[in-house]
Amino acid sequence: GGTNDVDINAPEMWEQINTFYLSVSRAKEFSLKLDHLHDFFSQIRNGSNQFIGVTDSTMSRDEGWHFARMGRMIERADKTSRIVDMKYFILLPKSYDVGTPIDNIQWSALLSSASGFHMYKQKYGTIDPIYVAKFLILDHNFPRAVHYCLLKAEESLHKISGAPVGTF
């Protein structure tokens, strides 16, 4: 395509998409029983991560790459905010459960679901709900933190628009 097209030009990207598609298509031939769901979702997560890796290692840092990164960062920020929201309003709706072992287990699971358990433990050590929320929402270095994602989306938006930083 032309310079304004958002294309998938790298054969490695097409190969990864095709492999992922075939893998997911084969899954519908099998019944997705509860004991197989973990493997199925791990396969989806790994396929997505592999595509992101191939994309980042093969695409020029042009408008198409920035557009894809901006979308990925907005989706990631949305996912993380939904995870935190779910913990506050669904998993532990009773205030007297706050600080109990089940609360701490849920916060640990929340970190794991955002692929942040080990990074959190390196930074803060023990599980503390305030620090977990701070880490997942405000951290500048964790790639799934809402703030980090929005900073990267804004960087790409500036690259795409050509507008100087601080103008919107």
Model-predicted regions and their roles:
Residues 1-168:
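Alpha-helical transmembrane segments and their helix-helix packing motifs
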